């Protein structure tokens, strides 16, 4: 399989392991019994399950913060207001607890696997490689994401660096962005190494695509280009002709490379809808029950006005009751969470090549036109633009293609130090927002661990 999948299994081992790592060891399940590959897979599955909550609000909050979304005054708006007042107060702790606590649980699971003695466990080398590949990919995604959300620009301090299992009474300290970035790169390369030998829940190509994302946002454009190129040239993925099928099909879409798949057939109390439920409810195309509409002051709205026939707007956005809704990216409450898909690889390959050479090639133009042509865009590129003009084109293209998918618009604006807007259309420069748009730690964690930011 090519995607990250949540196995919402009902067998008792997974439930027990998940509880063990998140709370205290239940009777009869102690560390000396967590010593076989079946248990290691169960721990990975528990970490996959944590992703549902980890990414639950990773689209809604950033889209408000960057001004892409406008919030309706309906039920559920209360806490989200905190994401629109960052200009004066920064982000509120009420917005960030889910990501912090679910990350800690997932780190706990995968660090147990990585530090376990798999060599002496029964099983083939391929089976062990698959388990380790899954664990390192999960850990790479976690470190990449917490760095982007929890790092304080002024000090460089960030989320704790977790490479071992943290005991129930053990304290941790803050790490740095530099350390988290280095660890993400180490883990993604280990994931690629193990998954190349044997696919687990994830595959080598899924890890390679996420590696391209990591290096791109770390501004290592040589490696970003190389890995995006490898994914594209693998021939394993192709663009959908009907864009709505991407989100309806999710994991089975021909262009999705790395996806978190949800299965709500599990009815255990801990199984809530997470990202699927949150995004379906919040982006619902209803003036009375939906919550997020397109902010008319946003860059995305301006791009839509400039080319209203673009299929990314006609097939995925809906005008209704005087608002523009983005419901088609989250068509059901079981929608899969797409992390990487093929268009991002084309955009990454082209931009990385230009960043490296400060020049534009015909291949760069072709990469962007592949994405534009699929969308029926009116502004396909002719000739060879200058490097600066082409980078502007790619920024706009990435904004159209990946808006309201996780947090790409926010991360990309920060990477390029672009201006953003608020709900009312006021413009904020990079200097205005970079020391405010970060996630605070939960107060109880600050108090217990004596975090000094």
Language-model-derived ranges and their functions:
Residues 17-63, 379, 418-453:
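Membrane-proximal, proline-rich intrinsically disordered regions
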Residues 78-149, 189-198, 332-342, 352-355, ...:
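Conserved, well-structured interaction surfaces
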Residues 230-359, 367, 416-453:
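Elongated scaffold/linker segments in the mid-to-C-terminal portions of large proteins
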Residues 181, 221, 359-361:
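TPR-repeat structural position
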Residues 44, 107-110, 114, 181, ...:
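Inward-facing hydrophobic residues that define packing positions of alpha-helical scaffold repeats
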Residues 28-32, 58-77, 152, 156-160, ...:
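Short, surface-exposed recognition loops and adjoining beta-strand edges that mediate ligand/DNA contacts
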